[in-house]
Amino acid sequence: MNALELINIGETELRQKKIESFRLDSELLLSKILNKKREQILINLDQKISQKKFFMYKRLIQRRSKNEPIAYIMEEKEFWSKNFLVNKDTLIPRPETELMVEKIIEIFKEKRISILDIGTGSGCILISLLSELNNSKGLGIDISKKALIVAKKNSEKHKIQSNIKFLNKSLDAKFNEKFDLIVSNPPYIKS
């Protein structure tokens, strides 16, 4: 079986399950299995796929067909032009959150500030801000120790370790230090 045939199989299954981005998702899942960029696969659709990779791909297609978010299956999500690790212990960054990051950078772009990120999750907001606001520092807090592990990995991945800390604290935690900016983007509550 080649890459095109496998993508078509995945596309058919996802379409039948009413997954809107059936073609893109089937291509992305194959890129994960083959550990290649999607574009590399698309220019070499006749490449042969092993039976082992076929079964791995089918498992990912099954997860997606049950409406598991593609970001959790891929274990990453792009935010502020960077790829962030995500998993079920973190929320998936939303595109509209980038508007908040953009506004904050506009306001503080020439300043050195101290930032508190409440409910940091994957750390994407704080890491994105610190990558743009030179010499600023940040503290990300979260009640989930597992989310903080992901946030720390993301800070290492994006080389923002020297001016960032993560602590397992709740919203009502007290801090000795003062912050110039407090950010938070908690999950939406369904009404």
What does each model-identified segment do?
Residues 32-106:
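Conserved AdoMet
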Residues 1-57:
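A short N-terminal interaction module
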Residues 7, 26-27, 57, 67-70, ...:
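A general structural signal for well-ordered alpha-helical segments in protein cores
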Residues 96-191:
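Conserved SAM/SAH cofactor-binding pocket of Class I
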